[in-house]
Amino acid sequence: MQEGEDEDEDETPSQQLAYSLLQHYIQGVEAKDRTVRYRCVQLIALLVNHLPAIDDEVFVELKDLLIRRLHDKESVVRVHAVVALTRLQGAAEEGSEEGQEMFRALVERLKHDPQAEVRRAVLINIEPTTRCLPYILERSRDQDTLTRRAVYLRPMEEVDFRVLKIRDRESLLDHGLEDRDASVRRACANLLSGHWLHLSDDDLIKLLERLDVGNGKVASKALETFFDLYPDILSGLTYEEATWTAMKAEHAFLIRTFTEHCHRHDQTSKLDQVLPDISTQAYFIRNETGEERQELVADELSFILRQFLGIARLADYSDEMGRRNMFTLMRQMLIKLGPEEELIRAVMEVMVRICVDERDFTQTIVEIISDLREEEGGGEDEKGEEEGEEEGNKETKETEKVHRLLKSLEMARCMFENLRGSLQQSTSVPGLLQELVLPAAVHPHLEVREVAVTCLGLACYLDKRLAAQRMELFLHVVRYGHLELQIMALKIVFDLVMLFGFQALSTSLEDPHEIFRLIADCSGEGETTIQTLAVHGVSKLLLADLLDDQQALKSLVLLYFHPSSTDNARLRQCLSFFLQAFGRMAYKNHDRLCEVSLYERGSLLLPYLSLSVTIFL
C-alpha cells in the first residue's frame, strides 16, 4: 500500500480529497489543545482506510507522529492513535523496519498503558500474528473485566487455536472458565463451543485430543461447560461395546466426566444408556490390565485405567453379583499393582464404595498388606538360601524390596485418607502401625521415611490417644530430620494441635511445654522455610484462640518489624494479614497488641539502631 506519487493519476477525486485532508490533519496532531489533537488523530484513523497509497515521506512522518501520540497524556487521544497506527501497520511491508517499530510501540502500550480502554483498543485492533499472540494471551489476566473479555471476543475468534502450544490453550481456557466475572466466563465458553469446536469438525473427541486431558482440570472444566450449554449432548451419548473394548484416553475421560456430571446434578437415570452393568465394567477394567492392551504407552494405559476406576467409584452396587466381581478384581489389582500412588488411590476409592463399612474396608486392606508382606518374607528366605550371589543382583533385589515396602506404605496411606471414623474400635490398625509404619519411619531410604511419617500422621488425626503417644516422634523428626521430613512433621504437629489442643498432646511427654518450646524455636531464627511454616502455624493457633501466650504474640510482632524478615515475602504477607485480623477479632486482642507495641518499643527499635550505627561506622 506504500507507493510513490506516480500513481496519483489513478486516484479518484474522493481519494485525492482524503489525501489532502490527511496532510492537513497531520499539522494538528501535536497541537496544544487536547480537543484538536483528539479530532485530528480520530480523523486520521478514519482516512487511512480510504487511501490506496501513501507517499513514503508522509508515511514516515505520520508513523512518527502517531507513535509519539501513544504517550499523550489524554487517554482518548492514545486510543485513536492506537487505531490509526494499527491500520497504518497494515500498510507497512512485512518485516520492514517501520513495521517492527510500530509493532514494538503497540505491544508496549498493550502491556503497560495505565488506562484499560487503551489496552483494549490495542487488543481489538492489532493483527493477531504468531509473534503477537503471547502478548494477547497475557491480557487474559488483565485487571480490567472488559479487557479480559475482549481477549475471547475479538483476537481469539480470528486465530486457529491449533497454532497455540498446548500449555497456552490450557492457560487461556483456565483463565477464562475460572474468571471471577460471569461475562468473561461466558465469552470463553462461547469461544470454546463455537470457534474451537468448529475447527475440530464439531467433534468433541477431536477437541479433547487437542487439549491435555492428562492434566484433567482444564479439560474437565471445558466438558462441564459443554454439558451446561448443550444439555442435548447428555442424551446423545450411548453405550457402544466396541468403544469400551478399545477405549481411547479422550473417550474414557469424556465418559468419566459425564458420569460425575450426572451424579452432581442428580441425573443418574441417564447413566443407564451410557454405562454397562457392574460385571461388564469389571471385565473391561480387567481387559485394560491384560496383555491385549500392552501396545499402549504405559502413561496412557494408566490414565485410561484411572478413568475406568473413577467411573466404578460412582457406580450403583445394588447388584450383589456385580459387587463381588468388582471386589475380587480390586483385590487382585492391589496385589499386582506397582507403587504408583494415583492408581492405588483410585482402587482404594472403589474399595471404600464396595465394602460394607469402614471396619470391613480397614480389615480388607490390612489383610492385603499382610499378604504382601508375607510373600516378601517368603521370597527373602528362598533367596537367602542361594550362595554366590552377584553384587549387581543384590542391589536389584534391594531396590525391589524398597519398591514393595513403598507399595505397602502407599496402600496404608490411601487407606487412612479414606477413613473418617475413630481407630479405637479397629483391632487391625495397631498391628499395622507396629509392624509396618513405625519401622519404616526409621528406614535409611528417605522416600520410605517420608511416606511412613505421612501414614503415621494420618492415623494420628483419627485417634487422640495415638496422637499423644506418637507426638514425641514427630518432635524428634522436626528437630533432627531431613528438611523435607522436618516440614512434613511440623505440619502434622500443627494439625494435631488444632485438632486436639496442647494439653491433650502433652500427656505422654516428659516436658509438658516441649511442643510450645519447639514451635517457638522454629518460628525464631533458622531455616527460612521452617520459620515461615512455623509462623503460619502460630498465627493460626492465635487466631483460633488455641494459644494464649503473650510471648508468642510478642515474637511475631518483633519478627514483623525485624530487618531480617524483609526478604521473606511469604512470611511478611502472613504477618501483615495476621496482625490486622488478630487486632480486629476481639477487643482483648487489640489491647494485647497495644501492650506489646508500648512495652517493647526498645526491642522494636534496637535492630534498626544497630543497623544505623554499623552503616555510619
What are these regions (language model features)?
Residues 1, 166-438, 524, 528-617:
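Long internal repeat-built scaffold domains in very large eukaryotic proteins
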Residues 1-143, 150, 155-162, 318-319, ...:
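Alpha-solenoid helical repeat scaffolds
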